[in-house]
């Protein structure tokens, strides 16, 4: 049996950089405003994993009303989510993450993001794809007000 999950997240810029995305610190003049470290890529990926096992979203499991999660490293959240996936008898088939941002430029950091995600999801890097695109200066991402990310995962019953 296979299951598919989709996730989406967005955070606006504010404060000081760097931007933490895909488990990697990307130099930029601003960071992302969030209760956790604001890693939109890992938040979308975590939501996709939770969606695939019909377990809600990260807001349900790690609410921003709980100070326990204030400033938390999103890689720890992702690992916890993947533990839940494995408890349901699934493993990751593949994941595809799309980062939507006018800035900062992501290309130099994509390989490091893939490595971090593959490590945290206990899989081969060939099962992880990360790509970045812009909105051609349209909308809030085009105006450099924030970053959005979408993620899709395929889970395989073990």
Swiss-Prot record:
CC cofactor: a divalent metal cation
Binding-site list for a divalent metal cation: 9, 11, 43
Site feature Transition state stabilizer, where: 35, 134
Enzyme class: lyase
Domain of life the protein comes from: Bacteria
CDD domains listed in its UniProt record: MECDP_synthase
Listed GO biological process terms: isopentenyl diphosphate biosynthetic process, methylerythritol 4-phosphate pathway; terpenoid biosynthetic process
Binding site for 4-CDP-2-C-methyl-D-erythritol 2-phosphate: 9-11, 35-36, 57-59, 62-66, 101-107, 133-136, 140, 143
Pathway note: Isoprenoid biosynthesis; isopentenyl diphosphate biosynthesis via DXP pathway; isopentenyl diphosphate from 1-deoxy-D-xylulose 5-phosphate: step 4/6
Enzyme Commission code: 4.6.1.12
Keyword Lyase: yes
Annotated catalysed reactions: 4-CDP-2-C-methyl-D-erythritol 2-phosphate = 2-C-methyl-D-erythritol 2,4-cyclic diphosphate + CMP
UniProt record similarity statement: Belongs to the IspF family.
PANTHER family the UniProt entry points to: 2-C-METHYL-D-ERYTHRITOL 2,4-CYCLODIPHOSPHATE SYNTHASE, CHLOROPLASTIC
Subunit text: Homotrimer.
Name listed for the protein in its UniProt record: 2-C-methyl-D-erythritol 2,4-cyclodiphosphate synthase
Organism: Vibrio vulnificus (strain CMCP6)
Gene (UniProt): ispF
């Amino acid at each position: 049996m296979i299951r598919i999950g989709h996730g989406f997240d967005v955070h606006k810029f504010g404060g000081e950089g760097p931007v933490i995305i895909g488990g990697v610190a990307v130099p930029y003049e601003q960071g992302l405003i969030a209760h956790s470290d604001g890693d939109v890529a890992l938040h979308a990926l975590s939501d996709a994993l939770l969606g695939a096992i019909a377990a809600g979203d990260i807001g349900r499991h790690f609410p921003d009303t709980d100070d326990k999660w204030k400033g938390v490293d999103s890689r720890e959240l992702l690992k916890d989510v993947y533990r839940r996936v494995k408890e349901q008898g699934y493993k990751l088939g593949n994941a595809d993450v799309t980062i939507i941002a006018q800035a900062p430029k992501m290309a130099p950091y994509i390989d490091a993001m893939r490595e971090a995600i593959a490590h945290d999801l206990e899989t081969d890097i060939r099962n992880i794809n990360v790509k970045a695109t812009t909105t051609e200066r349209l909308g809030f991402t085009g105006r450099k007000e924030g970053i959005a990310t979408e993620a899709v995962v395929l889970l395989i019953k073990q």
